[in-house]
Amino acid sequence: LADMKKRRIWLWQGDPLGSAFFDASGLSPVPLPITEVYTSLSTGLIDTTIAPPLGAIALQWFTQTPYMTDIPIMDGIGGLIVSRRFFDTLPPDLQALLRRTGEAAGKRLISETRRDNAKSLAVLKQHGVTFTTEWKDKESDIFGLRDRAAAVLAREDYIPADIYDQARKALEAYRARKTGK
């Protein structure tokens, strides 16, 4: 983290999740719209970005950042959300269809994203990007920051506190089952 405090890190302007993470870490990011990142890397206004491998390639940011780490801090989250009131008006066969196709599409998206990430990492390596792994010695610190940022978002009611608590309990139960504790 001390090394990161020396960096000029891009934060997607208006991103409350990123802001909470940086607040929890004590880092001071440079908020910019995504359209200004490449130019800002080129001019030195920023020297560090957070992006998935495919994004770093598509936006050509990797040409300005010769080092990359694989810290798992960025998740893509999405979904088709409909109100319970609307969903309940659908006939049972359409409800089942929506659930079945949604689950299949979600699994396919995860599989394709993982495949694209693996391909993108190979492309980045071919272009001379150096991958660092020092963070793995401090993995618990990184995840502790994530947890503190989530708690801040719950306190600020960005994430409803009751939903945050339910999610934390479900995660703890999952981890306990997975480790057998």
Spans of model-derived segments:
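N-terminal secretory/targeting leader peptides
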Residues: L1-K181
